[in-house]
Amino acid sequence: MLPQFLLLLLYLTVSTAKTITGVFNSFDSLTWTRSVEYVYKGPETPTWTAVLGWSLNSTTADAGDTFTLIMPCVFKFITSQTSVDLTADGVSYATCDFNAGEEFTTFSSLSCTVNSVSVSYDKASGTVKLPITFNVGGTGSSVDLTDSKCFTAGKNTVTFMDGDTKISTTVDFDASPVSPSGYITSSRIIPSLNKASSLFVSPQCENGYTSGIMGFVTSQGATIDCSNINIGISKGLNDWNFPVSSESFTYTKTCSSSGIIVEYENVPAGYRPFVDAYISSENVEQYTLTYANEYTCKNGNTVVDPFTLTWWGYKNSEADSNGDIIVVTTKTVTASTTAVTTLPFNPTVDKTETIEVLQPIPTTTITTSYIGISTSYETFTATIGGTATVIVDTPYHITTTVTTFWTGSVTTTTTYSNPTGSIDTVIVQIPSPDPTTTITEFWSESFASTTTVTNPPDGTNSVIIKEPYNPTVTTTEFWSESFASTTTITNPPDGTNSVIVKEPYNPTVTTTEFWSESFASTTTVTNPPDGTNSVIIKEPYNPTVTTTEFWSESFASTTTITNPPDGTNSVIVKEPYNPTVTTTEFWSESFASTTTVTNPPDGTNSVIIKEPYNPTVTTTEFWSESFASTTTITNPPDGTNSVIVKEPYNPTVTTTEFWSESFASTTTITNPPDGTNSVIVKEPYNPTVTTTEFWSESFASTTTITNPPDGTNSVIVKEPYNPTVTTTEFWSESFASTTTITNPPDGTNSVIVKEPYNPTVTTTEFWSESFASTTTVTNPPDGTNSVIVKEPYNPTVTTTEFWSESFASTTTITNPPDGTNSVIVKEPYNPTVTTTEFWSESFASTTTITNPPDGTNSVIVKEPYNPTVTTTEFWSESFASTTTITNPPDGTNSVIIKEPYNPTVTTTEFWSESFASTTTITNPPDGTNSVIIKEPYNPTVTTTEFWSESFASTTTVTNPPDGTNSVIIKEPYNPTVTTTEFWSESFASTTTVTNPPDGTNSVIIKEPYNPTVTTTEFWSESFASTTTVTNPPDGTNSVIVKEPYNPTVTTTEFWSESFASTTTVTNPPDGTNSVIIKEPYNPTVTTTEFWSESFASTTPSVSSFESKTFYSSEAQSSLEIDSSNTFMTSISVSTASSYDESSTIVSSAFPTLHISSYSLSTSFVPPVTLPRYVNTTISSSPSFESSSMYSSVTSAVTSIDNDREVPTSTTTYLHSKLYSESISTVIQTKSSDWSLSLGNSNKPESASTVSEESLHYLSTPGPSSSEYSISFTSEKEGHVSSYVPRVSYTSSVKVSISSTMSSENGMSATHTFGISTNTIPSSTETSIKSATVTTPVSESTNTGMSIFMSTTTESKTTDITTETSVSGEVNLGSATVKVSSSEFISKGTVTRIMPTELTNSESTFTASPSFVLTSTESSVIETPATIEMSSRSSSYSVPLSKLRSEGETTRVIPTSSTATGSTVIGSPSSVSTSNESIITGSSSFVSTTAETISTRSIVTESIVAGSPSLVLTTTVLDTTETTITETSIVGESSSRSLTFKASSLSKGEITGTVTPEMSVSTSKATTGTTSEVSIKESLTTKVPTFTSTTIKPETSETQHSESRTTQIPYSETKGSQLSTANSQVSQTGSSKSSIFESAISKDESTFVSATVKSITTPAVTQYQTSLPNPAVSVSEESGKKSSIIESQTENSATQHSIYFDSIETSTLSNTLANTLVSGAMKNSETTSELTTSDKAIGFSTTTETSIPGATNSALSPSVDSGKSSMLGWSGGIVSTVSTSTRLEDSTATSSSITAANQDSLNPSTVSKYPHGSETIDNGSNGSSHSSSALASTISASHSIKFSAHQTTLSQSLISSSTKTVIASTYDGSGSVIKLHSWFYGLVTIFFLFI
């Protein structure tokens, strides 16, 4: 037993051990002590001593727990010990084993185990010293090469790891004093291998080695291990002259046990050849190596320098020192770190010691990236032998660039990383240009225009910015005047103008509303004068306190008192008085509490009074009954509760004790029922006579005879001669206990005395009296009581007798000394205690045990066990209590369990009844009680509000019963169109017309006429001009007077600042302007020249220049100007520019034009005039919105949405006396024709004009063209200008139009969405925006079977976001769809369930808006779901369900796969799935069709609709067969097939013997050679008969028993014959199985029904080819026929049978002519599936099949010659199926099915998709494809007829370059994906129709 217990203890200890971390918590020091003759402090030289601090906490560390210290780059431990203990105060708290890394791992480690200690501790800590040496290389092994890079000479950080705890210290390492240019030798002992590792590195050749010889030869006694040789070349050495890499090179080696020689050649410069090997040197004190050192450098130097070195050998005194073999093996384990262990080894038996390197499962880390801010990790574990994978998804940011000007002289770029988003900001600051005066004007265009007027050097440039009118915000204020006042504040462009209207005070009505935001909002609606202003204050909802009062009326009244914000609202509900139930509870507080719970009308109010617990007086009475009775009288609070317990009389046990008083005391203790009462009699102490004897035993004996009170007690002590030490302890009992521990002779006996309160020391003395005396000295508390016992010397023999008296008598007979005294004790008879026990027997047993006097006799009654009744109650404590009441035999035991009250969750539901219902579900303890309240539906009020978000939100607020539900719809604010009118009043009026959501609000502003401000400007003309600009209301009209420029006088001054300043003083017209230039002294050199102009000019020496636009202006107003001002319009162009002194490149990136038709005009007018510095370029383009799809090149796809024309022009002016003009214009109109006109003219100074024009047209290619582009390039060369040498503009527009194809069958989709692109400039700035798509989808599917007709689903998709990433895998076919509403068809037809959210990757569904269930009547139930559901999905599922109804077969057809891995949180149900399809890398589609017909399976579905309520839906399905079909797999796909499991089916596989036969024959003739190969394969099975039976409950009265038996083996024969003349393959086979089903009532006495099914499946396949010359016709025909015969017998003696027959035939014929192969295929398929309902009696079917234009011969099929061609064939199949069914009510039902199929096929790829649609991907030869669809009609006579409707799908493709890539996207892998043209066909349709 003890070994088993120890084994169990060991098992429990091992099984509960855990891994802890953080024990090693400090790296106190790392010091070096020189060993042997090492002369420098290198990391590899012994000995380094590491002092580490450790700490163990008893609360977290248990015996057997383990922890590990990882010591990177540590080679070994310099000690003969194998372990070290972690000790503190002499106690070993843990033992750590040394695991040296040596040549096996790149680190060493300590594997520690917590020891079991006998001392109690909270925390133990200390330090441990470890003598170590580091690994910095030494061989070419992978471990040494890795560790060779651990350290460098100088200061290093050494870090060890204990779990996540890292401890570090710094240390200085000396470099090797040996020169690295000479030869390098090294030898290092590996203790675990008992070998030395020797290294040789050839001396350095700086230019490389031509050839060389290296190696070494051992002396006698030392051997070389040729299996461990490393040869390589290292690119350099580390600071200790060890290789850091090992690369392959050309060499030959010769190795034996006595030497290794390597001959090498052609070593590149910078590399050093090396060789290392293991050397065994046991039992010798030293060994000598002779080194071969011969080499020729590439510079021609040849060195031959062999040498010899003596190494001291390694003497190992371990058990394996006698030459045992050590083998190193590698083993993969499931641990997380690498460890080294030595397997058990007995040197007397074993000859091989094995060192195992335990390596963890290798892990491959794959790093991916995405645009984001956080890094995620996903680990895919692997078993041993596999490789685990860790996918690290790292974020990267994209940038947006903001360019600003600053006062510095250089361009700076600063990147600001966004810590919370994925878009960083790059701020580019460029030097500010010359001083510029900016004039901002408003104009009527919708885009901005900037015109820069550049004055001569040292002047002030002007920038005229024309901005669209700012929106105006009108603010109305009230003042104390009686009239109105209007003030207009005009802000800069892109701002908002303000109009402040001061009106006399209107009365104001303030309305306060509450909303769901956490902040307050105030909106003021100001009406015109004499109106009433409104202030709408939106505040966060106040908390509401509802007070319910009762009044005398018979109806209810509710009064709501809404307080101001930040207050508390009150709802006063006055209700008719409800009846009140008062419940009084007790609680643990010392005060009373009263809680009133007022329920809704017609309810019952509750008053819960919590009172301090009343004291309870329990009175127990005994009565004559044999059972117990308890009566509890609970008094009101502040009273005393009474518990009257009536029990059968308990037996009484009387115990007599002694105490220190001089009188007697009797105490009666009455125990609970079924217990034993106690009577404690306390008597004065009797005198005690103690007789001590010595005997020959080695232990002591004490016998105590206690007499009744007034008697004399006797103690007979038999002791060995040992002394006794008495130890006194305290315990909780009220009496003393003495335990004597007798030790062997020569020991010390111990007496352990347990005393109440004070300890007692008992001293026994001998005296001369003849009687015993006991004296007790009682000391105060915390003292020690003394008992002095004086005993006579003689021993006493006591004899006890029983007598009839009721008291005890003691007679002592004292004999002379050396005699024996006698004590005769007479005792009254002992009381008897009867104990009743239960045992497993069925009868009763009584046993009587008689004890000595003053004892208690026992009667043990054993009874059969009583039954037990368990009662569970709730109480107010927070813990559970269990009380067991055991009654006498033949009674019933009670177990009373008191549990804390369960929490209660109240769920309110609405139902269709007009009254309320409350159901309370009380769960067992530790559960949650539920109260389900069902209320009539509340009326709903819908309120629509506007909010600041860009999307719509619907919030439903469901109020308690008898309330009103609210639906709050939050819509984005409507766009507002503001119309301003003038009127004759002196005040402003604003009228706001607010329309419903998705509309446009109107603001009509009526304003008084504006004042006028006159502004005078200068311009380059010689005459004056006046322009009147009329601004919107509340603005100021402007009159702009343009005057010729005043002459300017320029004054240049020097000042002490480091920057230049230019001040322009502009005088009124006809005056003289002044320019004052203040320049710093350096570094400006000013050269003054005279010229013919009337003004001064300063030209700075500019080394760099950069500007976003170029400008020009007239130098003088007197110069000759072209009278036409057509080209003077100021237009801006956005450019990104860079300059240097030699060239200038300007790259213009035009945004995408979002217009319908436009004209693009570019004009270049280069007039040249003196001075040469007046050069200007004016460019403009309109502004427009654009968004982007990623493009790999700077191109744009133009989208069109309206008919307005926007000109774009670029004009360059060069003023000179000789004029020349060049104009080029490109215009595109809605006719899609491009026109390009080029013209130029020379205009001499004499004003004569010679013009030459040419016109070029560029026509748009046909609509099927894949791509064309038009580029416009203009170029201007600077005129003798050193800082503007050359500027080049290039812009391009690419328009992509591709063909499309449409189908009228299957699926029709119309996508309306905006596609826009973004131009990516050289700074890789990327802007990604999303578009909104509205997709109405209508699908129609016909299966051709009467059980399924049509499904139509119309979904309104309100939000589709198409995402295109910059990098990574791109799938343009995916989208994230959120369906906000769905419309389902009416009852009686199949309901299609559209998923509420679809994603292509992992997605989370929270609070799904709806969940649809289909009942047996095919109705739709919508249940709101408030659970959180997480699903990993690769595809979406659209279940098509039609459940069982009378007279029809039930079938469930999912048309697509269902995702796996779904998890539902919040309900006990789980989601099981059956199929998964994964599509990667392409827009292909994988369709999996699973048709399931199961046998009487019960499917239960759980839906959580708002915790904790639970909705259960049970669907009963009937199925007889399972068929799985997978079709249409296009592109790269991964699919997991469905595995169908049914509990009622037996599992088994066909097994048997396969016998192959093959014969080959060849015959030669003059006509040629004929070869024949005959292959035959036979499969014969021997399947034993096996039967499976499944019994499950059917109804409340019957149960279903299903028995399936398979007993007929399956046989199959395959044969093939191949020859050069013909080939033939045949295959036959058949199988048969039977299924027996029966239903039996639960009492197994009534036979209900039985069904026998027999299934026979014969299959025949024949294939024959013939090869006549020159053409070969090949035909193939395969067929499969399945028959199912089902019969059913019921008690009513009715017979029910079903016959199922299906035929499938396919024929293939080919024609081969020369090397041209054309294919044609003929497909014939007829399927009939006919079943009936449970009530059907008879059934019959007739199938007719005809193939027009073809014969039905299997071996020689023919095709209608009029329809066959080289490109394919066409044929037709007409099938007619007629059925009739007779029901019990003699109602006849007949149906017929007619199907017609016609196919035309090219030798190209055919891809089939769901719903019968097909896609044919042809080359460039063009084709047509037609398919048929079935429509169904139902007549009133219960007949179903299917007729064929022809639908033609045609495609015409004309392209001159079919291989042109239409669009490119970047998938992150560097490849370009070519997308099929159908997608861009949709894009083209979009362009053509918007």
UniProtKB/Swiss-Prot annotation:
- Keyword presence, Signal: yes
Q: Per the record, what is the consequence of mutating I885V?
A: In allele ALS9-1
Region annotation Disordered: where it falls in the sequence: 1237-1270, 1447-1473, 1552-1630, 1726-1761, 1789-1824
Q: Which UniProt keywords apply?
A: Cell adhesion, Cell membrane, Cell wall, Disulfide bond, Glycoprotein, GPI-anchor, Lipoprotein, Membrane, Repeat, Secreted, Signal, Virulence
Disulfide connectivity for this sequence is C73-C150, C96-C112, C205-C297, C226-C255
Repeat (ALS) residue spans along the chain: 400-431, 437-468, 473-504, 509-540, 545-576, 581-612, 617-648, 653-684, 689-720, 725-756, 761-792, 797-828, 833-864, 869-900, 905-936, 941-972, 977-1008, 1013-1044, 1049-1077
Primary subcellular site in the record, as a coarse category: membrane
Consequence the record notes for mutating M1301V: In allele ALS9-2
Q: How does it sit in the membrane?
A: Lipid-anchor; GPI-anchor
Q: What is the effect of changing S417T?
A: In allele ALS9-2
Consequence of changing V1065I? In allele ALS9-2
Tell me the impact of changing L1170F: In allele ALS9-2
Impact after mutating S202V:
In allele ALS9-2
Tell me what happens on changing M1429L.
In allele ALS9-2
SMART domains (alphabetical): Candida_ALS_N
Variant or mutagenesis effect after changing A63P: In allele ALS9-2
Question: Altering T348S: what's the impact?
Answer: In allele ALS9-2
Q: Where is the lipid attached (GPI-anchor amidated aspartate)?
A: D1867
Q: Does the keyword Disulfide bond apply?
A: yes
- Tell me what the record says results from Y1081H: In allele ALS9-2
Q: What is the effect of changing S948Y?
A: In allele ALS9-2
User: Changing I921V: reported impact?
Assistant: In allele ALS9-1
In the record, the effect of A1149T is given as: In allele ALS9-2
Q: What is the effect of changing V753I?
A: In allele ALS9-2
Q: Which PANTHER family match?
A: AGGLUTININ-LIKE PROTEIN 6 (PTHR33793:SF2), ALPHA-AGGLUTININ (PTHR33793)
| Protein name (record) | Agglutinin-like protein 9
Organism of derivation: Candida albicans (strain SC5314 / ATCC MYA-2876)
